[in-house]
Swiss-Prot record:
It comes from Bradyrhizobium diazoefficiens (strain JCM 10833 / BCRC 13528 / IAM 13628 / NBRC 14792 / USDA 110). It catalyses: 2 a quinone + NADH + H(+) = 2 a 1,4-benzosemiquinone + NAD(+); N,N-dimethyl-1,4-phenylenediamine + anthranilate + 2 NAD(+) = 2-(4-dimethylaminophenyl)diazenylbenzoate + 2 NADH + 2 H(+). Its cofactor is FMN. FMN binds at S9, S15, V16, S17, M93, Y94, N95, F96, S137, R138, G139, G140. GO terms for molecular function: electron transfer activity; FMN binding; oxidoreductase activity, acting on NAD(P)H as acceptor; oxidoreductase activity, acting on NAD(P)H, quinone or similar compound as acceptor. The lineage of its organism: Bacteria, Pseudomonadati, Pseudomonadota, Alphaproteobacteria, Hyphomicrobiales. Homodimer. The gene is azoR2. Its EC number is 1.6.5.-, 1.7.1.17. This is FMN-dependent NADH:quinone oxidoreductase 2.
Amino acid sequence: MKLLHIDSSVLGPHSVSRQVSAAIVDRLRQATPSLEVVYRDLTQTPLAHLSGSHLAAAQGAPAPAELGPDLAASAAVLNEFLAADVVVIGAPMYNFTIPSQLKAWIDRILVAGKTFQYGANGPQGLAGAKRVIVAISRGGYYGADMPTAAGEHLETYLRWVFGFIGITDPEFISADGIQVGPDHREKALAGALQAATSLQAA
């Protein structure tokens, strides 16, 4: 079994989402010692945002030589995702949504003919067999009963993205209110780490 581990926080060892995503991977490794893990840190090895020349090349136009490294990185990222049985993502909320580094990664895996296709009844996801677990951290509280709920574009966006490619039941472990104060951060992190250790292994 193969697991792809993605981190996107810019905070390094101070990141809550990184701590929780690591705990998720540790839990799955304990349950399946033979688990093969591929790790990609989107801040240490950032992907370029899509360009017009990249999109043109993807649609069959001649690719200039200088685009070669970008196309190679795109192919590597897509192949990592396609090969994975399980995908674990550390995703903090930045300005109400995902980090731009994670958006650049998503732009490389949402590829027509690979992870989705257009059919007579509209788009159809092709990646439904994968398990996706996301460790999210948010500075405030964005529950459905909160006045800030309309500003939540992290979990809602990721649910839509993964649903679009056929993964209709992504799992989320959340650490909320981490910027409200030290006590809130400690409690949120402890709860998320406990949820990670209690995660169903298969």
